[in-house]
Amino acid sequence: MSWDPNPVPRTLRCWRLRRASETALQSSRRAVEDQLKICGHRRDADVFELFLSKKELTEVIDLSRFKKLKYLWLHHNKLHGITFLTRNYCLTELYLNNNAIFEIEGLHYLPSLHILLLHHNELTNIDATVKELKGMLNLKILSLYQNPLCQYNLYRLYIIYHLPGVELLDRNQVTEKERRSMITIFNHKKAHIVQSIAFGGKVDASWDPKSPFKQKPAQRVPSDFAFANNVDKTVLDDPEDAVFVRSMKRSVMTLTSMNWDTVPTREERYLEEEGTETAQMLTVTLR
């Protein structure tokens, strides 16, 4: 172990850190006030957007005073975390790319978020990141590329699986093929149900190749208890699977072909009989 001839006292180190934090917050406060002056806002309730990009910010003051803030630009700074957005429930677009953010704790307070850019940061924990974003039901556009967590195997499918509402991930549209692959890889139970229905088989709700415990067998309704025109239905333990199976059974197939009874014969066309009906299409719907 190397010996430092001039050790810095612990109290002095803490004082320096506190002093640096205060200086960073003062710089952030000045940047916010400058933006308010530029936009001519006199009341916090009038602030709908803030441009704080490229300000060399390492910390940001609490922005909860801006209740109606909807658009926030903080890209190209030196931020390490997100602790300044606790009551900005109206925020819909947040630009945090090109920083040094290593955790995003605090984003789950933003239920209205629609666009979130986090590329070019230092995010490493993919599970913690997904956990923080799961509650954002309105999130449609997300960017996480150029983060260490992108090196995980099947990273993109993992994000799509846990955030099914996202439509544009890392500047690429989420495709139906990716969604099917995601179900096959991460949701074995639902994939098994889909395959069973597709091939006319019965659904075994207790099937789960990765289950660490023994599941209860699927309950069955007595055969003499009828529902509408169906008898002996399978009751699934998971309500989501029950809804999924029901939606699959409601699929409708429509077949369209020419109604040849309405097509005039060659003789009829030759004689040009009056009252000859024009050819019609015949549509058959199967449920």
Curated annotation (Swiss-Prot):
Positions of transmembrane segments: none
Pfam families documented for this protein: LRR_9
Keyword hit for DNA-binding: no
Keyword tags: Leucine-rich repeat, Repeat
Residues in LRR repeats: 46-67, 68-89, 90-111, 112-133
Domain LRRCT per the UniProt entry, residue ranges: 147-185
UniProt keyword Signal, yes or no: no
PROSITE patterns in alphabetical order: LRR
PANTHER family attached to this UniProt entry: LEUCINE-RICH REPEAT-CONTAINING PROTEIN 72
Protein name per Swiss-Prot or TrEMBL: Leucine-rich repeat-containing protein 72
